[in-house]
Amino acid sequence: MKIDYLTLFPEMFDGVLNHSIMKRAQENNKLQINTVNFRDYAINKHNQVDDYPYGGGQGMVLKPEPVFNAMEDLDVTEQTRVILMCPQGEPFSHQKAVELSKADHIVFICGHYEGYDERIRTHLVTDEISMGDYVLTGGELPAMTMTDAIVRLIPGVLGNEQSHQDDSFSDGLLEFPQYTRPREFKGLTVPDVLLSGNHANIDAWRHEQKLIRTYNKRPDLIEKYPLTNEDKQILERYKIGLKKG
């Protein structure tokens, strides 16, 4: 996969993209990273990339010329996913990360200021994505967050494919509780089932815990999840247990 970032602050990406999984993905030729400062593509002597909005209003708007010019230097095809980070976009999700992990080429347009000239949005962009109902100073941090979520799903990046298959959201539920050594710590013990060696019982316990954890923390996900009759019985027993205290 190749990822290009159009940004006014390419140095922001160094710390995140040159360590841990991102670094290994590049070393193993699973990922190619390129940052482009679109200020270099400004058309006046002051390298101006923003201007006042037509019709008045607060803040500055990113001009179309630098972004369009920068895009012309990228090897963009009809299959390239050009992503605009903006609050009005589709909320980012694990499902979106899975979809994007199958792309060969992604371009992130990371803006600043009040917004983008609408012609950037309508003529260059394939996907508008939001990280949530809040506003950040720029698109760099969301782009890096998305990159981490996407790249770890590329086959061969994590080494153990089961690693991301057990993650929260991979099957629509939150992840089950995890434990490691020591068996007892400050009077807190690991559930016996995890030490039993009975993998069928362990899998059943983990699924039950995923259902209960999701029910408690993300009931919206439970509403979307295709509960089996057994799942419904698990949750019903849990609710009865809560009432009994």
UniProtKB/Swiss-Prot annotation:
<dbReference type="InterPro" id="IPR023148">
    <property type="entry name" value="tRNA_m1G_MeTrfase_C_sf"/>
</dbReference>
<keyword id="KW-0949">S-adenosyl-L-methionine</keyword>
<keyword id="KW-0489">Methyltransferase</keyword>
<dbReference type="Pfam" id="PF01746">
    <property type="entry name" value="tRNA_m1G_MT"/>
</dbReference>
<comment type="similarity">
    <text>Belongs to the RNA methyltransferase TrmD family.</text>
</comment>
<dbReference type="GO" id="GO:0002939">
    <property type="term" value="P:tRNA N1-guanine methylation"/>
</dbReference>
<keyword id="KW-0808">Transferase</keyword>
<protein>
    <recommendedName>
        <fullName>tRNA (guanine-N(1)-)-methyltransferase</fullName>
        <ecNumber>2.1.1.228</ecNumber>
    </recommendedName>
</protein>
<feature type="binding site">
    <location>
        <begin position="131"/>
        <end position="136"/>
    </location>
    <ligand>
        <name>S-adenosyl-L-methionine</name>
    </ligand>
</feature>
<dbReference type="GO" id="GO:0005829">
    <property type="term" value="C:cytosol"/>
</dbReference>
<dbReference type="InterPro" id="IPR002649">
    <property type="entry name" value="tRNA_m1G_MeTrfase_TrmD"/>
</dbReference>
<dbReference type="InterPro" id="IPR029026">
    <property type="entry name" value="tRNA_m1G_MTases_N"/>
</dbReference>
<keyword id="KW-0963">Cytoplasm</keyword>
<keyword id="KW-0819">tRNA processing</keyword>
<dbReference type="GO" id="GO:0052906">
    <property type="term" value="F:tRNA (guanine(37)-N1)-methyltransferase activity"/>
</dbReference>
<feature type="binding site">
    <location>
        <position position="111"/>
    </location>
    <ligand>
        <name>S-adenosyl-L-methionine</name>
    </ligand>
</feature>
<dbReference type="InterPro" id="IPR029028">
    <property type="entry name" value="Alpha/beta_knot_MTases"/>
</dbReference>
<comment type="subunit">
    <text>Homodimer.</text>
</comment>
<comment type="function">
    <text>Specifically methylates guanosine-37 in various tRNAs.</text>
</comment>
<dbReference type="InterPro" id="IPR016009">
    <property type="entry name" value="tRNA_MeTrfase_TRMD/TRM10"/>
</dbReference>
